[in-house]
Amino acid sequence: MADSFKFDLVSPERLLVSETVTEVVIPATLGEMTVLANHAPTMTTIKPGLVTVKFASGETHKYVVFGGFADILPTGCTLLAESAVSADDMSPDTLQKRIDAAKAEIQEGNHHHEHLTKLEKHLYELTNLHEVLVAA
């Protein structure tokens, strides 16, 4: 049996997961990151994407996150998400509404270049996430 560690997934709305797990795959800003027990201490930002959690029981569950931070220690991982839901509760239609809202905000045109770049990056990440959900 693989070594296990404590994993917490927290959003401002609620605590989604606080369990013993064997593996977590997170959408770090610089690419997908697999966290296992005894991982080197790391802190990273999270982009919109899927978090895949493999519980000590062997069960796997996915969550959709919309940005945040992950604090990784050898004994545990805490993911503080700006917003998060179970992937079972996130439909492609709901995500499409977020994409449409991001497009509308970009089209308003009253943005400084730096803010516009962030909006475009966010739209790109949401679009990629939508493609992942539709394919799943």
Curated annotation (Swiss-Prot):
Name under which the protein is recorded: ATP synthase epsilon chain
Swiss-Prot/TrEMBL keywords: ATP synthesis, Cell inner membrane, Cell membrane, CF(1), Hydrogen ion transport, Ion transport, Membrane, Transport
SUPFAM superfamilies registered for this protein in UniProt: Epsilon subunit of F1F0-ATP synthase N-terminal domain (SSF51344)
The gene coding this protein: atpC
Membrane topology: Peripheral membrane protein
Quaternary data: F-type ATPases have 2 components, CF(1) - the catalytic core - and CF(0) - the membrane proton channel. CF(1) has five subunits: alpha(3), beta(3), gamma(1), delta(1), epsilon(1). CF(0) has three main subunits: a, b and c.
GO cellular component assignments: plasma membrane; proton-transporting ATP synthase complex
A GO MF term: proton-transporting ATP synthase activity, rotational mechanism
Subcellular compartments: Cell inner membrane
Similarity field: Belongs to the ATPase epsilon chain family.
Role played: Produces ATP from ADP in the presence of a proton gradient across the membrane.
Family annotation (InterPro entries): ATP_synth_F1_dsu/esu, ATP_synth_F1_dsu/esu_N, ATPsynth_dsu/esu_N
Organism: Agrobacterium fabrum (strain C58 / ATCC 33970)
Main location: membrane
Gene3D superfamilies: F0F1 ATP synthase delta/epsilon subunit, N-terminal
Pfam family, one: ATP-synt_DE_N
